[in-house]
């Protein structure tokens, strides 16, 4: 957010992230983003809260963060050779109003061997990530993963180098290319669709 011109502080609210088993999985991130934002109802004055939640969905099932290495292997084996959906929902919240939106991106994995999966897990340590992967660690070196919409947005604010900055400290380029294609927003898969957040904030 700082890179696109907004000053902010980060707080991680302690909320119950459970939801009804009957809830449409595509609505879960919106439900959780709203709950995260409401935690700050009595803590803000003129500030705007930006709360978000990201889910990875395969075959109408949400893949959470793996509980251990074996669980991560199981998740990546399940994702191998398939296309899954990543949804990031964002809630903008102030004393006077609330606005919620989401962005949806399809991610296709290459066919992966057990050896490749284990190498990825041991190198990238993805146990803290939904679906057991972080997009920034899985990209083909030299390939811009952003959508045309994102590229146009970054160029319009003179931040075309933001892609490279997002990859610093990642494992991209170490031969761990497990993503075949991203159809939609790269930053949505990263956890925040910055082009949409910017647009909504400017009109909030």
Language model regions located:
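Short, conserved active-site loops that position catalytic residues or coordinate cofactors/metal ions
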Residues: 10-15, 51-54
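Short loop/helix-cap segments at secondary-structure boundaries that form the rim of catalytic
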Residues: 2-4, 20, 42-43
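Anionic-ligand binding patches
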Residues: 24-204
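Short secondary-structure capping/turn micro-motifs that flank functional sites
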Residues: 16-18, 137
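N-terminal G-site helix/loop of the GST-like fold
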Residues: 1-11, 195, 204
């Amino acid at each position: 957010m700082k890179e696109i011109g907004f000053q902010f502080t980060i707080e991680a609210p302690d909320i119950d992230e459970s939801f009804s088993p009957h809830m449409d999985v595509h609505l879960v991130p919106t439900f959780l983003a709203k709950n995260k934002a409401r935690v700050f109802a009595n803590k803000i004055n003129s500030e705007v809260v930006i709360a978000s939640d990201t889910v990875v969905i395969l075959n109408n099932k949400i893949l959470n963060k793996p509980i251990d290495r074996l669980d991560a292997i199981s998740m990546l084996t399940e994702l191998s050779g398939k296309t899954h959906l990543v949804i990031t929902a964002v809630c903008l919240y102030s004393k006077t109003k609330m606005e919620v939106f989401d962005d949806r991106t399809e991610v296709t994995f290459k066919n992966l061997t057990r050896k490749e999966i284990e190498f990825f897990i041991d190198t990238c340590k993805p146990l803290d990530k939904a679906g057991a992967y972080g997009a920034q660690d899985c990209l083909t070196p030299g390939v811009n993963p952003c959508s045309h919409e994102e590229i146009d947005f970054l160029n319009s604010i003179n931040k075309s180098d933001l892609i490279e900055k997002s990859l610093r400290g990642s494992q991209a380029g170490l031969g761990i290319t497990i993503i075949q294609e991203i159809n939609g927003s790269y930053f949505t898969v990263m956890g925040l669709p910055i082009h949409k957040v910017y647009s909504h904030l400017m009109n909030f």
